[in-house]
Amino acid sequence: MNYTIEGAPMPVVICNLEGGETMLTEKGAMSWMSPNMKMETTTGGGIGKMFGRVFSGESMFINRYTAQGGTGLIAFASSFPGDIRAFEIAPGQEIVAQKSAFLASTAGVEMSVFFQKRISSGFFGGEGFIMQRLSGNGTVFLEFDGHIKEYELAPGQQIVVDTGYLAAMTAGCSIDIQTVPGVKNMLFGGEGIFNTVITGPGRVWLQSMPVAQLAGAISPFIPNKN
């Protein structure tokens, strides 16, 4: 499989497959394809994985698209203004991503639920509590919100993030929750009570326009139907 990622700020990834190659995707993610692409809807690994996907914010079912009788083409478009990034997954090169980041992948990539190891992260992490772990072998395409900034963290190096801005990280990074210091800062700072602290070693991808923050910003301007 080879691919190109085109367009901004609403990108699309166009995948060219050899005969017999398969792509996995969420329902409704396919944008266009050649007529020889065969679709099959599956639970993608049984009941346990099916409910695990639901718990991490994804659909119960996975669509498999296979090129039959020769080369095929299939495209997957982003659902929100932002960026599509390709990641090569292999043993020891796992990626942990925000909920609903998964767009498509080759057949060898596996998706599971990633829970924070620290109890405090679970209770107070908000959007960061449940994330997706991408493992196995292959290429995965993730969609992020807004502009993406990447950081390489050395062992023990930290970055403090408003939780919704964490798009993805390599599995070697760890997460904890930090309370905003000072009661006045908590009550009047407008930044919430908790921040996410990411500790290296590893790479971190941060997004500039989380959907939840955008929705909150525009909601006062949406007319009330009542």
Locate the predicted segments by residue:
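Composition-driven recognition of glycine/serine/threonine/acidic- and proline-rich low-complexity segments
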Residues: 1-226
